[in-house]
Amino acid sequence: LAELVGRSEHIVRATALEARSDWTLIGGRRRIVTDTRIRVEETLGGRPTAESEIEVRVLGGIVGDIGERVDGQAELVLGEPSVLFLMPITPLVAYVTGAAQGHYRLLSDAQKSLRLRPSPHLPQLVRPEESAAAVLSGATLEEARALIRGAAK
């Protein structure tokens, strides 16, 4: 967790509002990326974002009848809140730090408490017991706040 926190400029609780996929050049090759506009509802760590809404870019998506899947990428669900660890590309566009390792869905448990769940496409990790996912998965939002702040010290 300390590494993920240290590599992230922004750590936020946010909701995905809309997404669009398009072609872009990455490393001299045409690739499909999906940009999701998120509404930042709370800064959990790092610096606050410059705006209340920013774009989060992940590799892969569908443009026309062509799809490109990139394993291990975060999958933001429209309308669903999540905790995101972000690295800015520009002031208004960011990548998810560590791809799916930096995305946690916020889902209600039986007591209506929001709990962090790993991104749906989290790959198999080396030393998973030491990963941020092992520490954060199942934590309430309150517990996650404390864990993130503790890891930042």
What does each model-found stretch correspond to?
Residues 1-153:
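Transition segments tied to proteolytic processing and entry into folded domains
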